[in-house]
Design a protein with these regions (language model features):
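N-proximal low-complexity "stem/linker" segments adjacent to membrane-targeting elements
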Residues: 1-24
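Short, structured coil segments at secondary-structure junctions
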Residues: 27, 49-50
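Active-site nucleotide-sugar/metal-binding loop of Leloir-type enzymes
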Residues: 67-79
Length: 122
């Protein structure tokens, strides 16, 4: 069963990163990829994972795109998770998010600690 969480992933030419990110949020009931006219196959990757692609004409920095998405998209879920395309939700974190959402307590927001990992090219 999918977890009632809406995921927003703002992108522009993120084909290199997007597949891994989308694989990590397959548990979420809806995923929105907010694109700014990518030319590298980003939208095709999003479609492969059945994410809804929404175009946003890029006219500013990431905060503007994020705020536009939060104000414009009609979410079906009370919980929203914002991710960059180069971020992934680890399996343990996905389980914790699902538990919090299913509990339905009075908490309205969470801070998720991040772990930074770097890979060498080649």
């Amino acid at each position: 069963m999918k977890v009632p969480v809406s995921v927003i992933i703002p992108v522009k030419n993120e084909a290199r990163n997007l597949e891994r990110c989308l694989q990590s949020v397959g548990w979420a009931s809806e995923v929105f990829v907010v694109d700014s006219q990518s030319t590298d196959g980003t939208c095709e990757i999003a479609a492969k994972f059945r994410a809804e692609v929404i175009q946003f004409k890029y006219a500013g920095g990431w905060p503007k795109k994020k705020n536009w998405a939060l104000q414009t998209i009609e979410f079906t879920n009370p919980w929203i998770l914002l991710l960059d395309a180069d971020e992934v939700v680890m399996e343990g974190a996905a389980g914790e998010i699902a538990e919090v959402v299913r509990r339905g307590d009075s908490i309205v927001g969470y801070w998720i600690n991040r772990r930074f990992m770097f890979w060498e090219n080649g």
